[in-house]
Amino acid sequence: MDGEDVAALVIDNGSGMCKAGYAGDDAPHTVFPSVVGRPRHQGVMVGMGQKDSFVGDEAQSKRGILTLRYPIEHGIVTNWDDMEKIWHHTFYNELRLAPEEHPVLLTEAPMNPKSNREKMTQIMFETFNVPAFYVSIQAVLSLYASGRTTGIVLDSGDGVTHVVPIYAGFSLPHAILRIDLAGRDLTDYLMKILSERGYTFSTSAEREIVRDIKEKLCYVALDFDQELQTSSQSSSIEKSYELPDGQVITIGNERFRAPEALFHPSVLGLEASGIDQTTYNSIMKCDVDVRKELYSNIVMSGGTTMFPGIAERMQKELTALAPSSMKVKISAPPERKYSVWIGGSILASLGTFQQMWISKQEYDESGPSIVHLKCF
């Protein structure tokens, strides 16, 4: 099976959002929430044709009457039945095509358990009958998207943050570090500190409003204490936000206090090191000969790295941690929200990649464990 004659599909399954589209495109065709909703009460919606589940945006819009579940927790698939529903929705409702006609490239979190890779492979070949399949580590794809093959990727999405050093296209597993702190936690923290101001948000519907406030108004301070002092003396950083019901709220130092948790997870009651210290720790776990190249190729990816000011702050903190002669360079490409998907699109459309696919024939001969031989 050659991937030449037909477009390969690239699906990046994140904890918060699923990004899917065609290899060779410069952006995903569809982006929707990785969520499956089931009715809380049987038979309350007359004439709905009683669907037993809803996926993505439809689940979000009906969230008042549904129980929402995210099948991917902290980057790892934990509920395969729901995951299958998300893939089904991706192929048939979002992309509107027959999966048995297209090679599929999926992404996985670093350190994804072996059994998970096999299960993914099995579902793709046995349930969806894809002609060819490949699975790639998310951070490695982000690095490809930035035009590098060596560097260290700070990938922070909705459910998990990873620091992944990569040398000549291969990740260095012994130095990969994971922090269970990402976008969802920052949204929750913002809900908490807004409630101190007297604005209460509690339901899952209200959490979406706070996520929007976070995405539109939050930023990372270059000097946190200095910023706090400034904000207490003037109202220059105050911004107003209109809620769906027309009420207008004012948000001040919460704008930079929420993302500060990335650098000081202790404010969330977490023992973890911040993203700056974790990046440094990861570099120090690598061979002394590659460190210089890693310091000068620090690449940010994922939606949680989209805060204004984050690259400058990272530059400042890492320059302070690194040896004084070391050149620290942070790359934060504007399309980094989708750089995992973009990297997948680039990889799957390379002529040299076409012999890398696991074909249906190879799968039938060797079974799911073939994935460990062909995808690394």
Curated annotation (Swiss-Prot):
Stated EC number for the protein is 3.6.4.-
Q: What Gene Ontology terms describe where this protein resides (cellular component)?
A: cytoplasm; cytoskeleton
Q: Fetch the SUPFAM superfamilies from UniProt.
A: Actin-like ATPase domain
**Pfam families named among the record's database cross-references:** Actin (PF00022)
Q: Which keywords annotate this record?
A: ATP-binding, Cytoplasm, Cytoskeleton, Hydrolase, Nucleotide-binding
MF annotations from Gene Ontology: ATP binding; hydrolase activity
Q: Which residues form a coiled coil?
A: none
Cellular localisation: Cytoplasm, Cytoskeleton
Q: Is the keyword Hydrolase assigned to this protein?
A: yes
Q: List the disulfide bonds.
A: none
Briefly state the protein's biological role.
Answer: Actins are highly conserved proteins that are involved in various types of cell motility and are ubiquitously expressed in all eukaryotic cells.
Q: Could you tell me which PANTHER family the record lists for this protein?
A: ACTIN
For this entry, the protein name equals Actin
Q: Which organism is it from?
A: Komagataella phaffii (strain GS115 / ATCC 20864) (Yeast)
